[in-house]
A protein has these predicted regions:
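Short microdomains enriched in Cys/His and/or Lys/Arg
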Residues: 381-397, 410-423
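Hydrophobic faces of well-ordered beta-strands that scaffold small-molecule active sites
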Residues: 15-20, 42-44, 108-112, 137-139, ...
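Alpha/beta enzyme core
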Residues: 36-37, 115-262, 268-275, 279-283, ...
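Iron-sulfur cluster-binding cysteine motifs and their immediate structural context
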Residues: 361-378, 390-407
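N-terminal capping/small domains of soluble enzymes
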Residues: 1-108, 113-118, 124
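Extended, intrinsically disordered, low-complexity segments
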Residues: 65-69, 243, 303-353, 357, ...
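Short pre-active-site segment immediately N-terminal to redox-active cysteine/selenocysteine motifs
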Residues: 354-355, 365, 384, 394
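C-terminal helical cap(s) of enzyme catalytic domains, especially alpha/beta-barrels
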Residues: 54-71, 218-235, 289-314, 415-420
């Protein structure tokens, strides 16, 4: 039986699956809904004193599902930080949520936001969390809304802080020096140089990093010739497809620094969690999936990881955390054939006719017009084949293998990495 217990910043947790900062960490009623599913950790809804308690522009969730099946899990969102006055939260929901989590073997991580780049506005929150008895604190510096504050003094609140290494260092260092519990810095995917930012907060003494917050986005309703939901950029690109971008950003961090990382962004399934952990994350968190698929997805994810570990023979999650990080590199470093590229391609697809059902998808989708379906011979490639593997990726029967034409050597079977056939 797989052991999902792991250690995160000195705290042993029952499994690496948690819920990131959202409604479900905002009060005990909602927190109980996800805690009851067996999560190992929970981040609170971000508390703050920016312009007083936030008033979310109701309605504030704008699902894009009606615009096509490709967008079934995507939405934009103008919900902001916690809408409860900070002092009220500090006296009621904060301590109550911490107590609820501890009673259920669930790590509670409060999330706080000061005002922009002024460290003095962050320190009081950190001291309050420490006095409350919290084990660690998340600095939510990566909010996707362009500007939270309504006045000029607040123009750098949110993502701008998490895009500048010098400013991030200054705020992180001040918070680290102010308390004795670990500080976690939350990143924004808007940051161009994640490695530089990660190095800055590690140097400042951050114990961990959360990556990534949501990106920003907007949508136009073509039927009404107007914006959909709101005429502004707000939290967007939520959904599983977002994972491709976020995971790449995460790897820029895990390949650069040694401090633990909370993996966030487009996680919907158990294998998404495994993917982030193999990419170097110590724990992984869900958010959007709870809204578009329901809180029951959490138990499915936890059970799925356990079953995967049993199937693969992993005894502990530590055995596969970071296994892909050493391989992460730049495309410029991948072996390539000598210029110019050979034509016709030395790499071609071969089709397993016992699996092929002549569906014609490869012929239809080949961008080079290089595949022709013959009734009795199956797919036949012509001289225009570029060896791109597009047909392989779209074959519903897994009937395509990429080979080196000259020798018949298998170059890629559609799983993992292709062979480095260029010497």
């Amino acid at each position: 039986m797989a052991n999902l217990r792991t250690n995160f910043l000195g705290v042993e947790i029952k499994n690496p699956v948690g819920v990131t900062s959202c409604d479900f960490g905002g009060n005990t009623r909602l927190a109980k809904r996800v805690i009851d599913k067996g999560i190992g950790w929970l981040v609170g809804k971000t508390v703050h004193k920016i312009d007083g308690p936030h008033r979310w522009p109701r309605p504030y969730f704008y699902s894009l599902k009606k615009f096509g099946p490709e967008l079934r899990d995507s939405w934009t969102c103008s919900q902001m930080f916690h809408n409860m006055p900070y002092e009220q939260w500090l006296e009621t929901e904060g301590p109550a949520t911490l107590k609820l989590c501890r009673e259920n073997d669930c790590l509670f991580i409060p999330s706080v936001s000061g005002i922009g780049t002024d460290p003095d506005t962050w320190i009081p929150f950190c001291k309050d969390m420490e006095n409350m008895g919290c084990d660690m604190i998340e600095l939510d510096t990566g909010g996707p809304h362009a500007t939270f504050g309504a006045v000029a003094a607040h123009k750098d609140v949110g993502a701008p802080l998490a895009m500048d290494p010098d400013t991030a260092y200054k705020v992180t260092k001040a918070c680290v020096d102010a308390v004795k519990i670990p500080i976690i810095f939350k990143m924004t995917p808007q940051c161009v140089n994640m490695a530089a930012l990660a190095l800055a907060v590690e140097r400042a003494g951050a114990a961990g990093i959360s990556a990534n917050n949501a990106f920003y986005g907007t949508w136009i309703d073509h039927e009404t010739a107007s914006f959909y939901g709101g005429p502004f950029s707000c939290g967007g690109l939520m959904g599983r497809a977002w994972q491709l971008f976020s995971l790449a950003k995460v790897l820029e961090i895990t390949a650069t620094v040694k401090i633990p990382v909370i993996g966030i962004g487009g996680i919907f399934t158990w294998d998404d969690c495994v993917r982030y952990m193999m990419g170097g994350c110590h724990v992984t968190g869900l958010c959007s999936a709870l809204y578009s698929r329901g809180v029951g997805v959490l138990k499915d994810v936890i059970d799925g990881i356990s079953a995967f570990m049993d199937r693969k023979g992993y005894k502990s999650v530590d055995e596969f955390i970071g296994v892909c990080v050493p391989e992460f590199s730049y495309i410029r470093d991948w072996p390539k054939e000598e210029a110019p590229m050979k034509y016709p391609s030395p790499i071609i697809p071969v089709f397993d006719l016992e699996k092929c059902n002549n569906c014609g998808i490869c012929e239809k989708l080949c961008p080079y017009g290089a595949v022709e379906i013959h009734k009795n011979k199956g797919p036949i490639i012509n001289e225009h084949c570029m060896g791109c593997a597009w047909c392989q990726g779209h074959c519903p029967k897994d009937a395509v293998t990429m080979i080196l034409k000259e020798t018949g050597e298998t170059i890629w079977n559609g799983r993992g990495l292709p062979s480095k056939w260029c010497k």
